[in-house]
Regions:
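Loop-to-transmembrane alpha-helix initiation sites
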Residues: 120, 124, 206, 228-236, ...
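Structural signature of hydrophobic alpha-helical transmembrane segments
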Residues: 42-55, 92-101, 171, 175-185, ...
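Hydrophobic alpha-helical segments embedded in the membrane of multi-pass proteins
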Residues: 28-31, 54, 76-84, 99, ...
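Long hydrophobic alpha-helical segments that form multi-pass transmembrane helix bundles
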Residues: 117-189
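Membrane-interface helix-loop-helix junctions at boundaries between adjacent transmembrane segments
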Residues: 77-78, 83-149
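C-terminal ends of transmembrane helices
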Residues: 58-70, 106-118, 188-198, 241-250
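Cytosolic-side transmembrane-helix boundaries in multi-pass membrane proteins
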Residues: 1-22, 271-317
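N-terminal signal-anchor module of multipass membrane proteins
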Residues: 1-57, 315-317
Length: 317
């Protein structure tokens, strides 16, 4: 029996869940963020989201048609990628640039590596990083959700010199600048509750990631307020709930998930606290995506009754 594709010890639990049903649950969980972005940033947020989804589905369909492969549109994974990438860009992101990110996510990161389940990193994550590196000006042009300063560039909470002056309520409700999906913590929490309630994801990764970040900032700043600001600011919550929990690029054991989450917290904290870049979530996720195979190997469950083979004696003895 070929065991190359067996990544966990038996017994293997089977269920009636399909890729389509899991992706559908993720889409439902993303709806609060999509609705919140439309309320906070207006009609263009809907346009950005719609274009991103259509582009991802179209690129996947075109790629499969050209290579005469079965179009996997029914699994809804391209829709999820399109929504997540849209939630990772500012409302003013030029449509042409956004479509480039969709192309990278679907064709290069997902399909060229063999399709769903074969990608080395989260497609939407890599698409966001490519957009950030290639179009830094567009990705760093924040719009503050206030009619009086509509379409004006505004600093995000992470760039504020004195975090103690920031309102936790404003951060929780999304009354601050940022990308579409990260601003409203309430919407993200609602999505998390749905995903956990439907057993689509485990709470282990979001809890260990966000919890470790809170502890690290509490130790570093000696301030509960500043630690909460760090948790509610930037892409931490959105990344922890919708990107770090990606099935393909996250560990499969509970121990592995906890190790992964804490490691994400360490890397993100290091980038934010000591680095020159105020965010850090995207690069932390990409870095840790590469370590997932090793985490899986180190935390692999030992089969019941397994006996480690004795080392062979040296020849001649």
């Amino acid at each position: 029996m070929d065991t190359k594709l067996i990544v966990s010890a038996s017994p293997h639990v089977r269920s009636e869940e399909t890729t389509q049903s899991l992706m559908a649950n993720v889409i439902v969980a993303l709806c609060p963020c999509v609705v919140a972005s439309a309320i906070i940033f207006g009609m263009r947020a809907r346009l950005v989201t719609a274009v991103s989804v259509v582009a991802c589905v179209a690129f996947e369909g075109l790629y499969c048609k050209l290579l005469k492969k079965t179009n996997p549109i029914s699994d809804l994974s391209a829709v999820v990628t399109g929504i997540i990438l849209a939630m990772n860009v500012p409302v003013g992101m030029p449509i042409g640039q956004l479509i480039i990110g969709d192309l990278v996510a679907i064709v290069i990161v997902k399909q060229l590596f063999g399709g769903i389940g074969m990608n080395f990193a989260n497609p939407a994550l890599v698409g966001r990083i490519v957009l950030f590196i290639s179009f830094a000006g567009s990705m760093n042009k924040w719009v503050f959700p206030d009619a009086a300063v509509d379409q004006l560039s505004k600093a995000t909470p992470l760039a504020v010199a004195d975090p103690s002056k920031l309102s936790l309520l404003d951060l929780f409700m999304g009354i601050h600048g940022g990308v579409l999906g990260e601003t409203c913590a309430l919407a993200i929490v609602l999505g998390l509750i749905y995903l956990v309630a439907t057993k689509t994801i485990s709470i282990a990764i979001p809890a260990s990631y966000v919890g470790s970040m809170f502890v690290f900032y509490l130790i570093a700043t000696h301030s509960v307020h500043e630690a909460l600001v760090a948790v509610l600011s930037g892409g931490l919550l959105f990344g922890a709930v919708f990107m770090a929990t990606d099935y393909v690029t996250s560990p499969f054991t509970l121990k592995g998930k906890l190790v992964y989450g804490v490691a994400l917290g360490i890397v993100t904290f290091a980038i934010r606290y000591w680095g020159s870049y105020t965010e850090g979530v995207s690069f932390a996720l990409l870095f840790m995506n590469l370590w997932v195979p090793y985490i899986n190997d180190m935390t692999r469950q030992t089969p019941y009754g397994y006996v480690k083979p004795a080392k062979k004696e040296a020849a001649g003895k």
